[in-house]
Amino acid sequence: MDSVEKTTNRSEQKSRKFLKSLIRKQPQELLLVIGTGVSAAVAPGIPALCSWRSCIEAVIEAAEQLEVLHPGDVAEFRRKVTKDRDLLVVAHDLIRKMSPRTGDAKPSFFQDCLMEVFDDLEQHIRSPVVLQSILSLMDRGAMVLTTNYDNLLEAFGRRQNKPMESLDLKDKTKVLEWARGHMKYGVLHIHGLYTDPCGVVLDPSGYKDVTQDAEVMEVLQNLYRTKSFLFVGCGETLRDQIFQALFLYSVPNKVDLEHYMLVLKENEDHFFKHQADMLLHGIKVVSYGDCFDHFPGYVQDLATQICKQQSPDADRVDSTTLLGNACQDCAKRKLEENGIEVSKKRTQSDTDDAGGS
């Protein structure tokens, strides 16, 4: 029994290691990319949230029940989702099959199927730890985009009276506002949201207005150059055609960037190969453990570590407060006079904090 407990403790301890280069980031330096793993951890009772494959299977099931897909097509898509590796292509073909032959985004039965699968999701939140961790980072300036169709994060945030807002790429004004950091609680759904019949798209051709808009593309790609993207619960995001079109294709010197991806380490050989491959994209792959059960706790602990970082503004406020009841001008002069001493004290404090992390 003791041996089992020690092994478990070692495993848990190993899953709690953090890269110093990541936990010393200010929250406002981060852009969180949320994938299906987050939804799966939050609402484990909904199979459609567990993976892309499960989501597509649930949509096919809904299409069959709603009788919006020919039985022969239902059988063919079930075969594809079982055998095909590129699930994004399967999902794209499924959308096309339930959309007008003209290629227009609406009207489409695909959205009805998504509503069948995802409606009333808020009632199924069972483990909000990951959502709370993400909100804590958003409170401190982190940005969020997602490849998910669901709005679990927004629903959870509204419960806490946060002014959450969902947006997709079809609203240029809001996208620019979000990308420039003026929408603190905005969540960009790059595939659209299940509640929006026009916004659900998997093919970059559906976003021609965006990808051909120089202003929008420059602002979005500038995020990839200047922010540290933190991929949370993402599996195939870098193979996602829309993500590639928005962030990867036109951003040079990706190896000079510093992004992070949290992954499950099921197989060591695969993990270390994936780690080496992702460095070419400027992405550091980090394992949260060898079991998905470690994921929520790892994200919570990681967010806690990052939120400990004091922003430069906070330091200035704290230093001014220490001066007691002096007037504001006197306080400023005092800070300037003792700037070197204050800086030294802060450096020593930072050193102490770093040693304890």
Curated annotation (Swiss-Prot):
Organism the protein comes from: Homo sapiens (Human)
Entry keyword set: Acetylation, Membrane, Phosphoprotein, Transmembrane, Transmembrane helix
Record localization: Membrane
Residue positions, PTM N-acetylmethionine: 1
An annotated GO cellular component: membrane
Location (main, coarse): membrane
Pfam families in the cross-refs: SIR2_2 (PF13289)
UniProt GO MF annotations: identical protein binding
Protein name as annotated: Protein FAM118A
Residue ranges crossing the lipid bilayer per the database entry: 30-50
Chain positions found as Phosphoserine: 311
Protein family per UniProt: Belongs to the FAM118 family.
Ranges in a coiled coil: none
Membrane topology: Single-pass membrane protein
